[in-house]
Each structure stands twice: as structure tokens, then as C-alpha cells.
Amino acid sequence: KPSGYESYKDYDITKDFKDGEKSDAVSHDYLYYSVMSEAQDVMYDYLVKRDKVSSQDLKNDKTKESYRERALQELQAGGYSVKTTIDNAVYNAMQDAASQYGGLLDQGGNSGVEVGNVLMDNATGAILGFVGGRSYENNQNNHAFDTARSPGSSIKPIIAYGIAIDQGLMGSSSILSNYPTNFTGGTPILHDGDKGTAMMNLQEALNTSWNIPAFWTYQMLQRHDVDVEGYMTKMGYKIANYNIESLPLGGGIETTVAQQVNAYQMLSNGGVYEKGYMIDSITDRTGEVIYQHKSEGVQVFSRATASIMDNLLKEVVVKGATTQFHSELKNVNGAAASADWMGKTGTTDNFADAWLFVSTPGITLGG
């Protein structure tokens, strides 16, 4: 971690308010609206609890909407101070990078390609910085927290291999089939147009991100009646149908950057999922802290499973078969490249989406 991470978390959203008036969209950006959205959720919960609103009353949409409006009004005019986890230096550096190099995404005849990134503290889930998009003025969709897309192959270590290892059905040296295979309907399972090869170990399957081994691994989980949904629900995933054959390849899954970063945070945190958050505390005008974030870690994978998966994904980064991240980082910052990196890529059909998630023991960055 760069020095100052623990002390330089000083973005206070309430400083953006002017005379208690509501903000206008022109003067704010992704940061303001992302923080405000989470702060409104926190304030809503506080007001409902303070006023002892019953669960029965909250079934009334008008009551819920009324309290959401009150939550926003309280934040804007109630004299509250909202402290976040956002590190200004980190956040600004991420915006500068997106601004200076975002144009590279438009090469090759592409135009308007968007970007979303999240940087998360592994031990706590604190979000230290993010990129919501290339330009809030041109596109108000928040590609870090709101836009949901297929995760492609980046889901393989989470929904297939990780669960199989955790269930004792697979080990780090397991041999898997990559022989040509079809989906039930007869469509070949391809990898960059390749129909498959032969048997291979798990490390090779991950390094190249072959699809067929992940397919068969998920089939094995289903044959053994493994509660895959139980695992995924612990991490906040909402998947409508767990019987989709292409699920371990990203089919039938829609996820945000923040959600997927959180899954890799779990792998780098001994299997403990710490839900990502930006609101550290809210203090009222008298100085009383009405909200303080508290850790509610959930053990998703065993520590042993997380360690095995972490080691496998280290070689994925170092070998560089699917990403040049490590070699390019060496050229830019040798000290940063020497960190204990692990990670995984993911792409969707016709490269509509391209993902990369990388972690050190301290932080996870992805998008």
C-alpha cells in the first residue's frame, strides 16, 4: 500500500452542498452521485429505525418513497457531515489516467468505448477510488457501480474452479478435459475459434482461460448437487437460472465492476467477503455519530481454498497468456510490478466487454 492510505481519506460529500440547497447535475460528477446514493441508503435506514417504522408499513411504496426523499433532504440540509473511504489522491490519479489514456480504447475503429474501475481495500471492503466513466458530461451511466454486464471468463475462478476446490472435488494439480465438446443443443464450445485440444491441468486451463474445462467443472458441481447458489448469494450475486450450461463462461450472469472486484477481494482476503462500501461515518450537527461502518465479513471459501486459488491466479498474471498487465507494469513502475499480483481476465462475444481483475494481498483493482 502507498503510505497515507489510512490517514488520507478526506472526501466529505457535504462540502459540495451550498447553503443547504439541492445540487444540480452540471456541477457534480460520478463521485458526488455515487457517494450520495450510498449515503441516502444509510440515512434511509437510520430514519426508519429512529422513527420505529414497522416492516409492515415499509411494504407501502409511498411510505418507502417518502422516507427516501426525507433521507436526501436530511443529507442536503440537515447539517450532517458524511465521511467516506475515498482517498482523494488515489481517486484523482484514477481520473487522470482515464482522461489521458481513455482515447486508446477508441483505436481500431471503435468509438465511445466506456470504462469503469474500482479500487478496493481487501481487508475491509473500503472503496479507495473508482472510475465511473470517461466523461460524466457525455455519459451519466456509472460504469463502476450501476452498469451490469456479462463477466465473461472472469467468473470462472469464482463460480466453477473455486467452488470445486472448496468442495474437495478438485485440487491445484487436477487434470481436466479440454477435448472438443458441444453444448446440449449441438453448438461447439469454442475458445477464440478453437474447438479444444486434449487433457490439461488446472493451471494451464486458467492461464489460457480455456472454456471447456470450466464447462465440465460446472457440470461436475451440478452432478454432485453442490449449492452453487449458496456460494454466490453470499457475495451478493443475483443469478436467475443456475442451470444455464454457459454459466461458468459468463452466460446468464450480469454483474457490475464493483461486484466482481468484491469477489476477487474475497479471494485475496482468505475467503472472507467484505462488502464494498464508501460511507465510513455520518455525524449530525451536534457531533454525534449516527452511523459508523462496521465489518460484517462472510466466509465464502475456506482460507485454504482462497490460498490455492490465489496461487493459481498469480501464474495467470506472470505468464501473460491473456493479459500483458504484468509486463507492461514492469516498464512503467518496477516497484509496483514486484508486488505479489494475482488476477484474471474476461471477455464477452466479439470483445463487447473486456475485463481485468488484479489483486495484491492489500488491494484489488478491476474493471
Task: Label the model's feature ranges.
Residues 31, 35, 39, 86, ...:
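Stable alpha-helical elements in mature extracytoplasmic
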Residues 83-84, 116-120, 127-131, 174-175, ...:
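Structural recognition of the beta-strand scaffold that forms the well-ordered cores
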